[in-house]
Each structure stands twice: as C-alpha cells, then as structure tokens.
C-alpha cells in the first residue's frame, strides 16, 4: 500500500466526508529513511519530483562538527547515540534524526541536519 499524504476524509467530529476528486500522484509519500549509526557509511540516491535527485543517508559513521568558539568545522567519528528527544526508543536502536545528541571524539554534538533529506550529518558541539 502507498504512503498517502493527503486528507483523511474525516470531519473533526469523526464523521465521513465525501471525496470531490481522486488521489493525485503528488500526494504520495515515502517511508522514513531511519538513519542509523554504523561502522560503514551507506547512502541511497532516489529520484524525486521534477527529475531531481535526493541523497538519503542510511548509515552514518562521521559527523561534520561546528565548533562555535573556534569558528571552524571538523569531520569527526561518532562513538555512540546518547539521546533522541523526538523518541526515546530511537537512542536504543542507534537511529539518528535532527536534534539527536551523539558522543564524538570532540564531545557531545547535537545534530542540526536532516540525514534522510540532506544525505549528510552536520552538528554543533555542545558546551560542557
């Protein structure tokens, strides 16, 4: 079955609404990427609307860390997933989303990019 991002045809009271047109192709979606911390990087290139390409990060090893007081960015290895505010179960499964806090060689880093959309992990170093 397809992932549909359109209206669910229910009124706020729970009653059914009638459909005034068919479903459109632009209302289709895709399942979430669910980027994981791993020992080997993996990306997936998919074709999106308009013939463009989107890179999805399936497995991540490194993160680009911005150090605020030094004003530079360094690529560093991820050691573990510490916390995921959006879903506590994600930290146990080593899933990485935007807002996830990971431990790196430099310290704790908060992920600022969307790995399923951008294809890269960017983050900012948290102060101690």
Curated annotation (Swiss-Prot):
CDD domains: Ribosomal_S8e (cd11382)
Source organism per UniProt: Staphylothermus marinus (strain ATCC 43588 / DSM 3639 / JCM 9404 / F1)
Keyword Ribonucleoprotein: yes
Pfam family for this entry, one: Ribosomal_S8e
Protein name: Small ribosomal subunit protein eS8
Gene: rps8e
UniProt record similarity statement: Belongs to the eukaryotic ribosomal protein eS8 family.
Keyword Oxidoreductase set for record: no
Region listing for Disordered, in residue ranges: 1-31
A single Gene Ontology CC term: ribonucleoprotein complex
Keywords on record: Ribonucleoprotein, Ribosomal protein
Regions of compositional bias (Basic residues) in chain numbering: 13-27
GO molecular function, one term: structural constituent of ribosome
Record text on subunit structure and interactions: Part of the 30S ribosomal subunit.
Gene Ontology biological process terms from the UniProt entry: translation
């Amino acid at each position: 079955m397809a992932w549909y991002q359109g209206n669910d045809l229910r009124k706020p009271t729970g009653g059914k609404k009638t459909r005034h047109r068919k479903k459109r192709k632009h209302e289709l979606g895709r399942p979430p990427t669910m980027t994981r911390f791993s020992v080997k990087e993996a990306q997936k290139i998919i074709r999106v609307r308009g013939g463009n390409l989107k890179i999805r990060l399936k497995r991540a090893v490194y993160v680009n860390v911005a150090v605020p007081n030094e004003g530079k960015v360094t690529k560093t290895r991820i050691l573990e997933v510490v916390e995921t505010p959006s879903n506590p179960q994600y930290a146990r499964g080593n899933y990485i989303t935007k807002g996830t806090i990971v431990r790196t060689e430099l310290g704790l880093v908060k992920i600022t990019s969307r790995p399923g959309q951008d294809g890269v992990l960017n983050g900012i170093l948290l102060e101690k």
